[in-house]
């Protein structure tokens, strides 16, 4: 996890360096993910004013892992509304991220080495299904908070 966080810092440094060439201050992987996943956050019930922040957390959970996303959430929790905190917390509670494919291949692939290709192919579908399940739970939680 420590090496992974260091790799994220390296990628953020490179993205920030390239962003400075084009006059974009504070460009990072998290900010890019925020804009990509902002519509998803808005669809699941996050107020639009906080959608980029929530989208960044959801993107971090999918692309990086849930530990990094929860760490980021704890740093900015005081700036978010209670509804957004609840929705984001539910959307981050899951193991559906890209690094999970490697864990699946390593764990299950050891029991069936000839099926590693199939496991890798199904891993992407498992990430999508797991993410949709988390987002559905987050949507229901957000809906129940408005009642």
Protein language model features and the residues they cover:
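Transmembrane helical segments that form the transport core of multi-pass membrane transport proteins
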Residues: 1-77
């Amino acid at each position: 996890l420590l090496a992974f966080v260091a790799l994220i810092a390296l990628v953020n440094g490179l993205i920030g360096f390239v962003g400075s060439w084009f006059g974009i201050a504070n460009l990072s992987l998290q900010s890019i993910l925020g804009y990509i996943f902002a519509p998803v956050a808005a669809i699941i019930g996050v107020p639009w004013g906080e959608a980029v922040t929530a989208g960044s957390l959801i993107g971090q959970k999918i692309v990086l892992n849930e530990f990094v996303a929860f760490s980021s959430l704890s740093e900015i929790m005081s700036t978010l509304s209670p509804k957004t905190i609840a929705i984001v917390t539910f959307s981050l509670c899951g193991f559906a991220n890209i690094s999970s494919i490697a864990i699946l291949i390593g764990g299950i692939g050891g029991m069936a080495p000839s099926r590693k290709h199939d496991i890798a192919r199904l891993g992407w579908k498992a990430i999508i299904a797991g993410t949709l399940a988390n987002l559905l739970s987050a949507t229901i939680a957000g809906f129940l908070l408005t009642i």
